[in-house]
């Protein structure tokens, strides 16, 4: 696989170097994201389930952002749960606060354990890559906001 097809946010470089997997890979018009866990900066599972779920979604968000995408580009998520029925309500509240309508396809799978002790969920996602024109259109409002925020002095100097 070409290195250019891989997506690895700087914050996840350690995972790539230590565990030998990419955060995501581009394939045709899809971004296929590796599973994200709800761990803190120390690499340990976050104790509070809702905070852990939010951190796992934040990991997905970081991978999407590195590829120029956001949650509105997600087509499908698969979630792997330790204690699925015990934590499903809390997970759904977090999921619904993060994923916008129209909602992506979702499969939730109950499992006995994850790679990191104490982790309750791993979230993997598949997203639709944007065509270059769509990326430019998405960036346009940001560029317009930057131009509007420029000091009036510069605008006056250009008029002279």
Indicate residue ranges for each PLM-predicted region.
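N-terminal presequence-like segments and the immediate start of the first folded domain
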Residues: 1-75, 81-160
């Amino acid at each position: 696989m070409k290195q250019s097809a891989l997506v690895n946010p700087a914050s996840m470089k350690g995972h790539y170097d230590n565990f030998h997997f990419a955060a995501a890979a581009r394939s045709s018009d899809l971004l296929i994201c590796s599973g994200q866990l709800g761990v803190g900066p120390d690499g340990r599972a976050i104790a509070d389930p809702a905070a852990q779920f939010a951190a796992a979604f934040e990991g997905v968000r970081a991978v999407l952002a590195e590829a120029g995408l956001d949650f509105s580009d997600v087509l499908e998520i698969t979630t792997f749960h330790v204690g699925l029925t015990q934590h499903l309500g809390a997970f759904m509240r977090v999921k619904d606060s993060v994923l916008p309508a129209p909602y992506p396809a979702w499969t939730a799978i109950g499992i006995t354990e994850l790679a990191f002790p104490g982790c309750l969920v791993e979230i993997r996602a598949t997203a639709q890559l944007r065509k270059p024109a769509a990326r430019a259109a998405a960036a346009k409002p940001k560029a317009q906001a930057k131009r509007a925020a420029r000091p009036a002095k510069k605008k006056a100097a250009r008029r002279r």
